[in-house]
């Protein structure tokens, strides 16, 4: 990626982690449809590989603003996709895709991080990977830890995530009838792919 700074990429990962970790509340719903968010999306679209995914997400948000009981409908989508059985869902856990759930714990230890007691989900939840990537990108921008060390850990995290993210995104597309979380997962997929190629 060329136009986005390490801090901007960190912010995108942190934002996506938040959206995949819990249902949207009224404040978040208002925020994603705000002018400030539209500016942020414009910035993301300046990165050509992200443009189509951001456009799709913006279309979903526009549709969302005219949807009756949008928050309740999105909460139902979130619950159906991420909290139910894996039969018709896109469970946001590495272990649901036959990946080593201990890998993220090792990566967190290597980064000097641990999961928060406030987050009542297993450590292999998608949001934990995204928080770690956000932390690593912020660290790259600060320059306090050798960049080579951070970059090595970033690549390991991206590789571990890429083992199951495409299947997760495909399941979001298959089972999210409204499409908001499908669009989010597509943006994440493209972001991770670009980040992974940016060695």
From Swiss-Prot:
SUPFAM superfamilies: TorD-like. One of its GO terms (cellular component) is cytoplasm. It comes from the Bacteria. Keywords: Chaperone, Cytoplasm. GO terms for biological process: protein complex oligomerization; protein folding. Pfam families: Nitrate_red_del (PF02613). Its main location: cytoplasm. It is found in: Cytoplasm. Involved in the biogenesis of TorA. Acts on TorA before the insertion of the molybdenum cofactor and, as a result, probably favors a conformation of the apoenzyme that is competent for acquiring the cofactor. Belongs to the TorD/DmsD family. TorD subfamily. PANTHER family: CHAPERONE PROTEIN TORD, CHAPERONE PROTEIN YCDY. This is Chaperone protein TorD. It comes from Shigella boydii serotype 18 (strain CDC 3083-94 / BS512).
